[in-house]
């Protein structure tokens, strides 16, 4: 609440009244079932304010009685009988329930206890791997069983299930991979599509795959497949219509009033406005009331965390101490857990988070939310072929979700760092990823599933024809496609690419590596790029980080530097003290080793020769150039960079080891757009290698540029 903002009188609402998931906003004729839960309608007694333990937090007590009492205290428990009666008789259902109501942990258990799993496994999909793992851990605790037995999980490169598993949490991408070999999903009796409102690219494809499997099983007289779509908020009419007019079940949850404040004037610097808001709240509110701030990404969060800590050291006497905690997906797991723990006496928790705190987790103690109204999201331009991460406005639905974090346990306050007029111009719903992302991976998966015509696939929200054609063109350039009888099919190379749980370009990189005798090195590099950041870069210790990293830096770029770090990590046996001294995330680096082992196994199953370059760095760089040729840039006469094929202006990201260098030509892994378009994860290459890799492609691009 910046002083210059001049907040108007507060507007009150009850959590859920803003988004279109409330019963009052359902269209006439839609079947809506209101399910009474603890804390709604005056029911719930003394337990009405108990909270579901956060996803990543272990159960509060090792004693079965305490765990069972916790289950019974959840808002959803009051509706258990009604829910089972409804779900038992429905093929499809859309279920809406507030974050923290217990729906994700309890619905699978209710279905299992009601006998739904006798004819097949109950699958629960999640957009994020951390949620799938922690939810499976929590539910296995509640069922008093070893993880991997009755309850298990499957995420990319990690399968903790057995023949006994009846409740299986998995990422949406992993269920898609299973559909490649079994399009009917025969092993499942029920698929629960959780956090459906996030509309990730994998989730949207999964909607169509599950719907088709359900229909086909019915046509073949197979055991029916039950499909339940769950979320804290969503466009229920769209989901209900898509799943054959599925009834909407609404869990009436605990609702506490929240005051919403807007700024009087637009804020040019949302980071400064957020900082001012935090310290005004901190100096006026009791220390027991915690603050949640929404920013866009790791760099912003770490920078603001440092600034908050520095300012907090110089506050006047009598002001509470401040415990500043960052929260983002690539943060080491142990540090993520800290947000769920209570602050020491006399301290206020200030949690600075990405949108991971919108719906995926429940954090207790939050009284104030500071919403910058910004989020980092992918955008794809099929004309230029560029996919970038860009900071943009949230949707109205996201804004209401953020606001609702303040009303989990008691009345709350949300400070929106934008005007009410600006809010009214926000998109109603978040644009699905499938309409704003590169679709090459999607098309490869659909073709691997032998979908007859990818252009007519039953998407809930259809991507533009330009996006689909651009994806097909990319796969064609990678040698993955061929045309047979007016139909697209996969080439032998394409089928091999689909066998890897990777982006097509990285799968192609591995498959190209035997030609350059560097498969061992490429497996390591691709594994490093497939895992959340293995490097920890606290802004407060920037000079120290640069000092210890000097010994690893390669003049050939970031890929080779990461390769050097991984080799040292392996040579020292994954020493955790070494990781700490060198600002390396030991957990993520261990995961890299596991990912690498699985990718290597896939290569061996294909009878691929696996050789090492034995220190020949050029062969590794040539391999990267031959497979990532669509992600390259060249130095221009004025000292700037432009992409090789579309001549889009780009710059080297400050985090790159090449930031102070001017190599003539580079290959990059990712583009990030902030104040300009930055390339991340770079490798120095020779421009001539690109023309060797795709001569016709670059000749065509050169002609277009001249014209």
From Swiss-Prot:
Residues 1-80 are annotated as: Required for nucleolar location. Residues 84-252 form the Helicase ATP-binding domain. Ubiquitinated, leading to its degradation by the proteasome. Deubiquitinated by USP36. InterPro entries: DEAD-box_helicase_OB_fold, DEAD/DEAH_box_helicase_dom, DNA/RNA_helicase_DEAH_CS, HA2_WH, Helicase-assoc_dom, Helicase_ATP-bd, Helicase_C-like, P-loop_NTPase. Pfam families: DEAD, HA2_C, HA2_N, Helicase_C, OB_NTP_bind. It is found in: Nucleus, Nucleolus; Nucleus, Nucleoplasm; Cytoplasm; Nucleus. Keywords: ATP-binding, Cytoplasm, Helicase, Hydrolase, Inflammasome, Nucleotide-binding, Nucleus, Ubl conjugation. A motif (Critical for rDNA-binding) lies at residues 547-558. Residues 471-562 are annotated as: HA2. Residues 50-64 have a biased composition (Low complexity). One of its GO terms (molecular function) is rDNA binding. Its EC number is 3.6.4.13. It catalyses: ATP + H2O = ADP + phosphate + H(+). SUPFAM superfamilies: P-loop containing nucleoside triphosphate hydrolases. Its main location: nucleus. GO terms for cellular component: cytoplasm; NLRP3 inflammasome complex; nucleolus; nucleoplasm; nucleus. GO terms for biological process: positive regulation of MAPK cascade; positive regulation of NF-kappaB transcription factor activity; positive regulation of NLRP3 inflammasome complex assembly; positive regulation of transcription by RNA polymerase I; positive regulation of type I interferon production; translational initiation. A motif (DEAH box) lies at residues 194-197. ATP binds at residues 97-104. Residues 277-450 form the Helicase C-terminal domain. Residues 39-49 have a biased composition (Gly residues). Belongs to the DEAD box helicase family. DEAH subfamily. Implicated in nucleolar organization, ribosome biogenesis, protein synthesis and cytoplasmic dsRNA sensing. Stimulates RNA polymerase I transcription of the 47S precursor rRNA. Associates with ribosomal DNA (rDNA) loci where it is involved in POLR1A recruitment. In the cytoplasm, promotes elongation-competent 80S ribosome assembly at the late stage of mRNA translation initiation. Senses cytosolic dsRNA mediating NLRP3 inflammasome formation in macrophages and type I interferon production in myeloid dendritic cells. Required for NLRP3 activation induced by viral dsRNA and bacterial RNA. This is ATP-dependent RNA helicase DHX33.
């Amino acid at each position: 609440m910046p002083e210059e903002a001049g907040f108007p009188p507060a507007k009150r609402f009850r959590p859920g009244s803003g988004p279109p998931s409330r019963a009052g906003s359902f269209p006439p004729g839609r079947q809506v079932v209101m399910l009474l839960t603890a804390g709604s309608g005056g029911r719930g007694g003394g337990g009405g304010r108990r909270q579901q333990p956060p996803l990543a937090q272990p159960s509060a007590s090792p004693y079965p009685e305490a765990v069972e009492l916790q289950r019974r205290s959840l808002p959803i428990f009051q509706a258990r009988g009604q829910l089972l009666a409804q779900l038992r008789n429905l093929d499809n259902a859309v279920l809406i329930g507030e974050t923290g109501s217990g729906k994700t942990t309890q619905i699978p258990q209710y279905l299992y206890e009601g006998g739904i799993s006798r004819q097949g496994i109950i699958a629960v999909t999640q957009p994020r791997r951390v949620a799938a793992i922690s939810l499976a851990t929590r539910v296995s605790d509640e069922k008093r069983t070893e993880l991997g037995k009755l309850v298990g999980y499957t995420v990319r490169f990690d399968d903790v299930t057995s023949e006994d598993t009846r409740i299986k949490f998995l990422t949406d991408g992993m269920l898609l991979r299973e559909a490649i070999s079994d399009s009917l999903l025969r092993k499942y009796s029920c698929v629960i599509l959780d956090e459906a409102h996030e509309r990730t690219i994998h989730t949207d494809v999964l909607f169509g795959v599950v719907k088709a499997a359900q229909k086909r099983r019915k046509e073949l007289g197979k055991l029916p497949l039950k499909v339940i779509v769950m979320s804290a908020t969503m466009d229920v009419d769209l989901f209900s219509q898509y799943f054959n007019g599925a009834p909407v079940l609404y869990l009436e949850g605990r609702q506490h009033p929240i005051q919403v404040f807007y700024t009087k004037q637009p804020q040019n610097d949302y980071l400064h406005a957020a900082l001012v808001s935090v310290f005004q709240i901190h100096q006026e509110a009791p220390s027991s009331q915690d603050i949640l701030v929404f920013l866009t990404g790791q760099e912003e969060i770490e920078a603001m965390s440092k600034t908050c800590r520095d300012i907090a050291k110089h506050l006047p006497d009598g002001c509470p101490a401040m415990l500043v905690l960052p929260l983002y997906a690539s943060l080491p797991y142990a540090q993520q857990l800290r947000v769920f723990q209570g602050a020491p006496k006399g301290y206020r928790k200030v949690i600075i988070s990405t949108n991971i705190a919108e719906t995926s987790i429940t954090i207790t103690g939050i009284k104030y939310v500071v919403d910058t109204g910004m989020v980092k999201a992918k955008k794809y331009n099929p004309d230029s072929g560029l996919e970038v991460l860009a900071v943009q406005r949230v949707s109205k639905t996201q804004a209401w979700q953020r606001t609702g974090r303040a009303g989990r346990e008691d009345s709350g306050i949300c400070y929106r760092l934008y005007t009410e007029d600006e809010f009214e111009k926000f998109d109603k719903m978040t644009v699905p990823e499938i309409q704003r992302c590169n679709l090459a991976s999607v098309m490869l998966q659909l073709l691997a599933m032998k979908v007859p015509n990818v252009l007519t696939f039953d998407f809930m929200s259809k991507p533009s024809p330009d996006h689909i054609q651009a994806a097909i063109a990319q796969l064609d350039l990678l040698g993955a496609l061929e045309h047979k009888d007016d139909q697209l099919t996969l080439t032998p190379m394409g089928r091999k690419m689909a066998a890897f749980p990777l982006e097509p370009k990285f799968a192609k990189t591995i498959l190209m590596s035997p030609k350059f005798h560097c498969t061992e090195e490429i497996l390591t590099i691709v594994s490093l790029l497939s895992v959340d950041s293995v490097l920890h870069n606290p802004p407060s210790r920037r000079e120290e980080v640069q000092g210890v990293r000097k010994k690893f830096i390669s003049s050939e770029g970031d890929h080779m530097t990461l390769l050097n770090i991984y080799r040292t990590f392996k040579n020292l046996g994954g020493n955790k003290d070494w990781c700490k001294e060198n600002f390396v995330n030991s957990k993520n680096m261990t995961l890299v080793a596991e990912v690498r082992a699985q990718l290597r196994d896939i290569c061996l199953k294909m009878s691929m020769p696996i050789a090492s370059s034995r220190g020949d760095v050029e062969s590794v760089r040539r391999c990267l150039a031959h497979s990532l040729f669509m992600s390259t840039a060249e130095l221009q006469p004025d000292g700037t960079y432009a992409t090789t094929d579309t001549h889009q202006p780009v710059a080297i990201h400050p985090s790159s080891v090449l930031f102070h260098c001017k190599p003539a030509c580079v290959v990059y892994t990712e583009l990030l757009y902030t104040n300009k378009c930055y390339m991340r994860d770079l490798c120095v290459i020779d421009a001539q290698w690109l023309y060797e890799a795709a001569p016709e492609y670059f000749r065509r691009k050169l002609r277009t540029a001249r014209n």
